[in-house]
Amino acid sequence: MKLFPLEQLSAFPTCDLSEVVAGARGLLAIQHYSDISCREIRTGFGDDRQGLEVQQMIEIGKAALVTGSYKLAVQWFLEAEESSAQSEDHKLKARLAQLVAEARETHDGHLVTNGYIQYNARNKNTYSCADKPYDQDLQSSEVFKLHRTHYEELVKFSSRDVDLARENISTNSFWKCIYIGLDPLRRKLCQGVVESRPALQCQFLHHQDHFLLLAPFKYEEVKRSPAAGIILEVAYPEEIEKVMEEARGEMITTTLVDYNQQGDVQDGYTSRRTSKVTYRSEKSLAEPLSGWTRRIELATRLDLTSTKLSSENYQIMNYGLGGAILTHRDSDDQGLEDPVYSESWHNGGPRLATVMVWLTRVPSGGRTVFAGAGLAVATRPGAALVWWNIRSDGSLDSRNHHTGCPVTRGNKWIANKWVKWPSQMWRYPCSHNRGQHYAGLNLNRVFV
């Protein structure tokens, strides 16, 4: 993957250190998913080659430690150490040597304990990693060899249908499959090295509606199970411009609902998502958003408007250079049995479906990847990607954990519309058959 000129990174090279810390997370995401080296970033790109200063590299290394990117932390501290080799500042050199030693110790500790850099409750945003320890003695230890073998088996097992295998493995092993075992495939899908299958089927959606028979929607089926497809011409260029213009002045740093070590719902893991967000309802921006909602309803036959809880407000998001979101899910099956879950029954029930409207084209990066389904989808302005978050029996469809790959060139804008489950009972009824999935958007074929 080609990373474009360093000067496009808003945090580099003319900025204060607080901006470096803010931009470092996106930079680390780009490195993880594109395999670009610290040296390439340090020395700069393009005709106007402007590199990084030592203190900037130290701050990036610290950010890598905080986010669990221990291998990159070591690499950035080593890069800073090499860059300062000619310096006469002995205190700086001693400090860098200490940082390198501490980062290596942390890195090796995780590898020897787990065989990989662990995704856990303490570091929810940790990137997986299965490299060898820096300590030569630890590389040959029986403990590390045992855990490394387990990791390789985990990756091999994750290449199967993890959703179907969920009942045959422990909960802990299942989540390791989702977040750790699938990471090598996820990275390839983000890079475009592994191409997803082309559209399985293209069709006109009209649902025997008299109006749509004259002007049907174009629909591309990109995955049959779990069902996912693209509806074309949901948003028009002038509408997109208006929504983006209105949203720009109200964007805030995104947080993400997650769980703490006690299993309670909490938010604030902002390091898992590097983006800006605002929310808009059809009432607050009626002209374009009401039109989008109406078109989505006509194309999908989902109920978005009959009650206040039929769907959520539009989530308008902007991902700049390096903007990404790590693997997550849009709904949760806890809500199906536990009404206490704050985002579930008290607010209209679980999210049955996600409708992601693309507002801009991203020249490089920015794919939406479903590693469990082997699917990567690139942006298409004005079109909407639709997928089911839960199966027709009410259980979570694990293959729809997805990742927003880092933007490596350009700017990514999307508008998410989450559709609540209870309001869809008449049009997309429940199934009594355990494990059955919803089909695509053809009402003559509701289940698969």
Language-model segment annotations:
Residues M1-A384, I390-V448:
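Fe(II)/2-oxoglutarate oxygenase catalytic core
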